[in-house]
Structure formats: structure tokens, C-alpha cells
Amino acid sequence: MALFSPPISSSSLQNPNFIPKFSFSLLSSNRFSLLSVTRASSDSGSTSPTAAVSVEAPEPVEVIVKEPPQSTPAVKKEETATAKNVAVEGEEMKTTESVVKFQDARWINGTWDLKQFEKDGKTDWDSVIVAEAKRRKWLEENPETTSNDEPVLFDTSIIPWWAWIKRYHLPEAELLNGRAAMIGFFMAYFVDSLTGVGLVDQMGNFFCKTLLFVAVAGVLFIRKNEDVDKLKNLFDETTLYDKQWQAAWKNDDDESLGSKKK
């Protein structure tokens, strides 16, 4: 129920600066009552209160504020980067550690097991030479470091000298001897046709002996057609420094002549 202010006295009505004061009462936390102001009726001279207006307070609305995600500090980023680098390095170390090594059933403890190369109770040295050549060819293509844990104990000196000659020298010697015999025969025939000196008489002639040594030396140095290119490369290497020296002096002379002309 609303409370009204006390009646206005006659003394206060006579005062022109007097402002009437009205009191409000709070009925509840959710409703406010606005008291009406009495007004004079022009006909009856009585006052009647106006209807009270009630205003409901708005209900509170829940507002959810989402906090922005906290940015990770730069230190954590650096730590993650270093962790990734360490992981990559670890993977590289693992890959480098898994190096393919030479494997052969006959290669045991850094040497060839000669018992596995035996044929009819004797060691087949040709097979040993072929196996060692294949191993060294593999090492050229896939270099492998030695260690004290797995030392290489095999030495080619254990292979007899006659096995080397039989393997490499005899087949090559047969080719060279056949080539030398053919060249010597045609040279002797050419000399005999020109001078009429026979083969026996040519052996006592200095010119014929010289041609014989030239033929033998040529057969030894030029065993294959590829050897001609090798000899050309060797000749170019022997004259390379001389050519460079002459080119340096030539450039200096050209520069000096150019400066004089200017």
C-alpha cells in the first residue's frame, strides 16, 4: 500500500518558491510503485488520486564472454622447434648407423674362409682372387670404415705368386705373344722383300734388331685400342704445365704491348 505525503499547509501555499515534495515507497525488489500526484478538480474542488503505474524491472540476462585462447609464448615455440630438430637429427643418426656392410657367407671374421674355396682337397685360388676383386669393387662403390671390433685380417700376400701369374699374366701373355709374332713376321717379310735379306741374316743386322725391339715395345704398351687414348692423355699431362707456363708469359706480353700502344 502506498504512503501519501502530509497535507500542504497554508503557509507553504503562500510561498511562491515552495516546491512540493513527494515520497515513494519500495514495495518489492522487482516492482516499483509510482505515486500519483493529486490535482484539484475545477468543478468540485476535491482531489482524486490517479491510477498507479507499475513498472517491472527487466530480468537479468546471462552474458557468456568467451576468453580468447592464450597465445603460446615464444619460448615454447623455440622449444618445439628444437625438439623437432633433435628428432630429425635422431632420425638421421639412425639412418647413418644403418650402413650396409659387405656380406658373404665365405667372409668370416674379417678374412676369407679358405676351406669353403676347396675343390678336390685343394684351394681354388682363382675363386679367392675373384671373390676378393668383387669385395674391393663393392668397397669402391660403398665405402666402409674399419673398426677395432671388426678388423680386416685378409692379406693378398697369402695368395701364391703362381696363382696371380696363372690368373692374369698367362692369358694376357698369350695375346701379346701372338700379336708380337704377327707383327714381327710382317716386318721381316717387308724387309726381305725390299732388301732381299733373309730372316736369319736380319738377326745380325742392327737396323732389323732395332725394328724388332720397337715391335716388342709397341706390343707391350699398346695392348688394346683403348691404350692409345691412355697414352695420348699421358702425353697431354706431361706437357700441361709447359703449356700453362707459356700461356702465362703470352698473356703478360700481350698486356705489356697493349699498355705501350695506349
From Swiss-Prot:
Tissue expression notes: Expressed in photosynthetically active tissues (at protein level).
Topology with respect to the bilayer: Multi-pass membrane protein
Predominant subcellular localization, coarse grouping: plastid
Transmembrane regions listed in the UniProt entry: 180-200, 202-222
UniProt effect for mutating residue 174 to A: Decreases interaction with GGR
Highest taxon in the source lineage: Eukaryota
Transit peptide: 1-39
Name by which UniProt lists this protein: Light-harvesting complex-like protein 3 isotype 1, chloroplastic
Gene symbol of the encoding locus: LIL3.1
